[in-house]
A protein has these predicted regions:
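N-terminal acidic leader/helix
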Residues: 3-31
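Long, compositionally biased
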Residues: 50-77
Length: 77
């Protein structure tokens, strides 16, 4: 596996874990969480773009962060 492929895999794996963990925090399905994050642009703008900052945190912390961010962004619309 090439470096860029491995790097992409790590980013996607992290995003999936964060989405599923955030969904559990909010009591919604993974699909609903994905769709809501996608609508707000948070999958790319928060989880993928900030991977280097976020992946060093605990999964519980990331789930809290992405859930809180989603709820705040949804309020602004």
């Amino acid at each position: 596996m090439a470096y860029s492929d491995n790097n992409t895999y790590r980013h996607i794996h992290f995003a999936v874990m964060a989405i599923e963990s955030g969904a559990r925090k909010l009591g919604v399905s993974g699909k609903e969480m994905h769709d809501r994050l996608l609508k707000q642009g948070l999958i790319h703008r928060r989880l993928i773009k900030r991977y280097e900052d976020l992946h060093t945190q605990s999964l519980d912390w990331v789930a809290d962060d992405i859930s809180e961010t989603l709820l705040n962004w949804e309020k602004e619309v």
